[in-house]
From Swiss-Prot:
Family in the record: Belongs to the bacterial ribosomal protein bS6 family.
Protein name per UniProt: Small ribosomal subunit protein bS6
InterPro entries: Ribosomal_bS6, Ribosomal_bS6_sf, Ribosomal_S6_plastid/chlpt, Transl_elong_EF1B/ribsomal_bS6
Keywords recorded for this protein, A-Z: Ribonucleoprotein, Ribosomal protein, RNA-binding, rRNA-binding
Keyword Ribonucleoprotein found: yes
Molecular functions (GO terms): small ribosomal subunit rRNA binding; structural constituent of ribosome
GO biological process: translation
Region (Disordered): 97-144
One Pfam family named in its UniProt record: Ribosomal_S6
Gene3D superfamilies: 3.30.70.60
Known function: Binds together with bS18 to 16S ribosomal RNA.
Biased composition (Basic and acidic residues): 105-137
Any one annotated GO CC term: cytosolic small ribosomal subunit
Length: 144
């Protein structure tokens, strides 16, 4: 059977519990039609690049699906009807990715960095050592 990666965006107003219920509902549709959901990832609330139906943020959810194309058609039909889902995208892939997705790896990488992009190590002036004497002081002591 073909493999699909399916991402849907739920309204920002929806609670995390409602998004979980949407995910369970979609998973039920997939399994009811003979498919299988191999991975489910919730990426949380993220900012959108542009407004979609007056929303600036949305809950992002990824599903990896193993099943025929009729499942994808039914899932997308259900999502068009649902008012809480503002956008969805399904892509057919040759094989499903094992482990965390690129977005989850990026979130882990962002947590390891500070606001300037460097590692979270050291403190104030930790690597520089003490100051060198200024040129004025050394030339003044030589002239005397």
């Amino acid at each position: 059977m073909p493999y699909y990666e399916h991402v849907f965006l739920a309204r920002q107003d929806a609670s995390a519990q409602q998004v979980e219920e949407l995910t369970t509902q979609i998973t039920g549709v997939i399994e009811g039609l003979g498919g299988k959901v191999t991975k489910t990832e919730s990426w949380g609330v993220r900012s959108l690049t542009y407004r979609i139906q007056k929303n600036r943020k949305a809950h992002f959810v990824l599903l990896n699906i193993d099943g025929p194309a009729t499942i994808v058609a039914e899932v997308e039909r259900q999502e068009r009807i649902n008012e809480d889902i503002i956008r969805y995208l399904t892509v057919r892939v040759d094989e499903l990715e094992e482990g965390p997705s690129a977005m989850m790896r990026k979130a882990d990488r962002d947590r390891e960095r500070d606001e300037r992009g460097g590692p979270r190590e050291g403190g104030f002036r930790s690597e520089r050592g003490p100051r060198r004497p200024r040129e004025e002081e050394t030339t003044a002591s030589v002239e005397e």
